UniProtKB/Swiss-Prot annotation:
Disulfide bonds: none annotated. Signal peptide: none annotated. Catalyzes the reversible isomerization of glucose-6-phosphate to fructose-6-phosphate. The gene is pgi. Its EC number is 5.3.1.9. PANTHER family: GLUCOSE-6-PHOSPHATE ISOMERASE. It comes from the Bacteria. This is Glucose-6-phosphate isomerase. SUPFAM superfamilies: SIS domain. GO terms for cellular component: cytosol. It is an enzyme of class 5 (isomerase). Belongs to the GPI family. Its main location: cytoplasm. It catalyses: alpha-D-glucose 6-phosphate = beta-D-fructose 6-phosphate.
Length: 540
């Protein structure tokens, strides 16, 4: 496709921005039905886009980008299993991980739905055995603790989801997650473990990932010291496709759960990578989790673009980053259970769309890839909201909240959850409408303080509400952002499904390891790195 910035649709949007940029949300909200017009439903989510900087003309011109970029055709191609990942010649089929068993999808001659449900069936049997006490450790003890060892998509997804759905952990099994090659990560987990009731899940597609295998070998040594070599087979399982390496490690390949090249790591929480999650919340709720994904997939696939929530949110991201110059995007869940959601989205969005060349290798001419970050409310209000409210940088933000908490406590005449949500609604209101100098002066504020207290408003937010944080709703939330990523990648004409920027650092680390450990002389090829390694060796 042509560079999107050279199209008439992009030029029309550029001209529109010149005329629209001074428009305020106060002005836009003079339209009586604005909130109703820009509120949508998708897979159990209630999504209010009305506090964004757009009007009908903006939306029409943003939607024109989808025509220019061939978005409809690319969506259909993704769901059909065409090789959208052109640099690795792979299908992009994370949506197949949540297809119903009766679905009909074959790719490259393989019945994908049948393959997915065969693995799900094995996962279900294994999780059921753990939860019922039929799977026992080497000494006959039931498993009470699972330690998931992985990194990137093999850690961030299941760790986030397990915390988010902790209210559904009803079988007495809990999970810890180890990812960092910093030994403090594993050591801090092992300190509190009972080897006899612990199961390690080693998640690595190739079973060669440096950080994961380093942690797995250290965990294996710890277990062997406690229980002996023969215990390994009853206390380790693998999420991998490399049967040879798994067997060499001492894991019975009958306890190896695979996934496929068409699943990227950051899109894999609903694959076998979610084994730890399934063991903690149970197969029934895991299937509800998948159902939420599928509901959002169907909304994305079938809903007309002007009412399609992932598409609209993706277009707003392009609007802010490429026209308003916003560089970051805050995700602010007013839910402690979603405290790891922003970290999860960082990999999903930034590893996907942090690209500087088009699919054909030519340089991009627009901005790409928003920087995602965030913390749960109300903590963020007492940390970084000051900058969002009164700073010089535009930070579009997504607020995520729920009508009903899993637990609640009294707070005077109200409840703590009502207090939480009062803050939630207040923040989006103040960010949108602020308070001007005239209004502040009318309150009797000293003249020299008026400008300090002005709240400019006009800070765009999207509000996402659901009745309750359930497995289904979490699945829908994740799929929402997955599809936002895909749409933006299509608009920018980049490959959202590779990650070559991760590889060179891995290679360099392997090359430097002998010098860092003292096995070889220091000669990295640049004086800075050489001097830093020499300092490290002299002071360790």
């Amino acid at each position: 496709m042509a560079d999107i910035s050279t199209t008439q649709a992009w030029q029309d949007l550029t001209d529109h921005y010149s005329n629209f940029q001074a428009t305020t949300l106060r002005e836009l909200f003079k339209e009586e039905n604005r909130a109703e017009k820009y509120t949508f439903s998708a897979a159990g989510l209630h999504v209010d886009l009305s506090k964004n900087l757009l009007d009908d003309a903006t939306l029409t011109k943003l939607l024109a980008l989808t025509e220019e970029s061939g978005l409809r055709e690319r969506i259909d191609a993704m769901f059909a299993g065409e090789h959208l990942n052109n640099t690795e010649d792979r299908a992009v089929l994370h949506t197949a991980l949540r297809l119903p068993a009766e679905a009909d999808l074959s790719v490259d001659g393989q019945d994908v739905a049948a393959d997915v449900h065969e693995v799900l069936g094995r996962m279900r049997d294994f999780a059921t055995a753990l939860r019922s006490g039929n799977w026992l450790g080497y000494t006959g003890h039931t498993i009470k603790k699972i330690v998931n060892i992985g990194i990137g998509g093999s850690d961030l997804g299941p760790a986030m989801a397990t915390k988010a759905l902790r209210a559904y952990a009803t079988a007495g099994i809990s999970a810890e997650f180890v990812s960092n090659v910093d030994p403090a990560d594993l050591v801090s987990v092992l300190e509190d473990l009972d080897a006899e009731s612990t199961l390690f899940v080693v998640a690595s597609k190739t079973f060669t990932t440096q950080e994961t295998l380093s942690n797995a070998r250290a965990a294996r040594a710890w277990l062997v010291e406690k229980l002996g070599e023969e215990a390994v087979a009853k206390h380790f399982v693998a999420v991998s496709t490399n049967a040879e390496k798994v067997a060499e490690f001492g894991i019975d390949t009958d306890n190896m759960f695979g996934f496929w090249d068409w699943v990227g790591g950051r899109y894999s929480v609903d694959s076998a990578v979610g084994l730890s999650l399934m063991a903690v919340i149970g197969p029934r709720d895991f299937m509800r989790f998948l159902g939420g994904f599928h509901a959002m997939d169907e909304h994305f696939r079938t809903t007309k673009f002007e009412e399609n929530v992932p598409i609209l949110m993706a277009l707003l991201g392009v609007w802010y980053s490429d026209f308003y110059g916003a560089e970051t995007h805050a995700v602010l869940p007013y839910s402690e259970d979603l405290s790891r959601f922003a970290a999860y989205l960082q990999q999903l969005t930034m590893e996907s769309n942090g690209k500087s060349v088009h699919r054909d290798g030519s340089p991009v001419s627009t901005g790409t890839g928003e920087i995602y970050w965030g913390e749960p409310g109300t903590n963020g209000q007492h940390a970084f909201f000051q900058l969002i409210h009164q700073g010089t940088r535009l930070v579009p933000a997504d607020f995520i909240g729920f009508a009903r908490p899993k637990q609640d406590l009294p707070a005077g005449e109200r409840t703590m959850h009502d207090l939480l949500m009062s803050n939630f609604f207040a923040q989006t209101k103040v960010l949108a409408f602020g308070k001007n100098a005239e209004e502040i002066a009318a309150e009797g504020v000293a003249p020299e303080l008026v400008n300090h207290k002005v709240m400019p408003g006009n800070r765009p937010t999207t509000t996402i509400l659901a009745e309750e944080l359930t497995p289904s709703i979490l699945g829908a939330l994740i799929a929402l952002y997955e599809h936002i990523v895909m749409v933006q990648g299509v608009i920018w004409d980049i490959n959202s499904f590779d990650q070559w920027g991760v590889e060179l650092g891995k290679q360099q680390a392997n090359d430097l390891a002998p010098a860092v450990s003292g096995e070889e002389d220091v000669d990295s090829g640049d004086s800075s790195t050489d001097s830093l390694i020499k300092w490290y060796r002299a002071n360790r």
